[in-house]
From Swiss-Prot:
Descriptive protein name: Ribonuclease T
Cellular compartments per GO CC: cytosol
UniProt subunit comment: Homodimer.
Entries under SMART domains matching the protein: EXOIII (SM00479)
Keyword terms of this UniProt record: Exonuclease, Hydrolase, Magnesium, Metal-binding, Nuclease, tRNA processing
Site (Important for substrate binding and specificity): F41, F89, F136, F158
Keyword Magnesium: yes
Annotated HAMAP family: RNase_T
EC number: 3.1.13.-
UniProt remark on cofactor binding: Binds two Mg(2+) per subunit. The active form of the enzyme binds two Mg(2+) ions in its active site. The first Mg(2+) forms only one salt bridge with the protein.
Native species: Pseudomonas fluorescens (strain Pf0-1)
Any one GO MF annotation of this record: magnesium ion binding
InterPro entries on file: Exonuclease_RNaseT/DNA_pol3, RNase_T, RNaseH-like_sf, RNaseH_sf
Length: 224
């Protein structure tokens, strides 16, 4: 299915009158920052262990900012692979008594409910995933949606905003920690590889780049 199909779908859903500034900024798409921590690199076989999502909002001057963060530790799905090296890298302890993990279905149902609420508040029709190396996060999100046979996924199935690419353009850095440093965003390496922390820092980075572009005159509030 082509990008043009989704563009036509969004245009067809638009009503009369002026659009919400956020909907006008991203052509009806709402940026939602997502980060996942996993049991490996294969979205079809490896466990989803943590997921966080931060919705993005816009102030009255047209500048964007991180709004609300949803975070869940997730139980590996039945038969999921978990690589020991992945646990060592992330520091996740599956048997920790305070981990309090939930099922994939519980996590995604709650996140999707919050995203749909944000879509309505911003006059948008579909969410677009923002991630640092976003294809990885979108791949695991889509794999979980397919496993659960979820019919109401608010995210675009293949388009995304990649902050590794955007940060490379804006700051000459593609590593999240270094990109944040270049953007004067505090980054604690001891907190890295937590889905919540990485999502919130990625959201700050994304908003900073979008706002910087606006300040430089790269985007004006118009509706074509």
């Amino acid at each position: 299915m082509s990008e043009d199909h989704f563009d036509d779908e969004l245009d067809g859903q638009g009503g009369g009158g002026s659009r919400h500034p956020m909907a006008a900024r991203f052509r009806g798409y709402l940026p939602v920052v997502v980060d996942v921590e996993t049991g490996g690199f294969n979205s079809a076989t490896d466990a989803l262990l943590e997921i966080a999502a931060t919705t993005i909002a816009m102030d009255e001057k047209g500048f964007v900012y991180p709004d609300h963060t949803y975070f869940f530790r997730v139980e590996p799905f039945e038969g999921a692979n978990v690589e020991p090296a992945a646990l060592e890298f992330t520091g996740i302890k599956l048997d920790h008594p305070l981990r309090m993990a939930v099922s994939e279905e519980t996590a995604l149902t709650d996140i999707f409910r919050g995203v749909r609420k944000a879509l309505k508040a911003n006059g948008c029709k579909r969410a677009i995933l923002v991630g640092h190396n976003s294809s990885f996060d979108l791949g695991f999100l889509n794999a979980a949606v397919a496993r659960l046979d979820m019919k109401r996924n608010p995210f675009h199935p293949f388009s995304s905003f990649d902050t590794a690419t955007l940060a490379g353009l804006a700051y000459g850095q593609t590593v999240l920690a270094k990109a944040c440093q270049a953007a004067d965003i505090d980054f604690d390496g001891r907190e890295a590889h937590s889905a919540r922390y990485d999502t919130e820092k990625t959201a700050e980075l994304f908003c900073g780049i979008v706002n910087r572009w606006k300040q430089m005159g790269g985007w004006e509030d118009f509706d074509d």
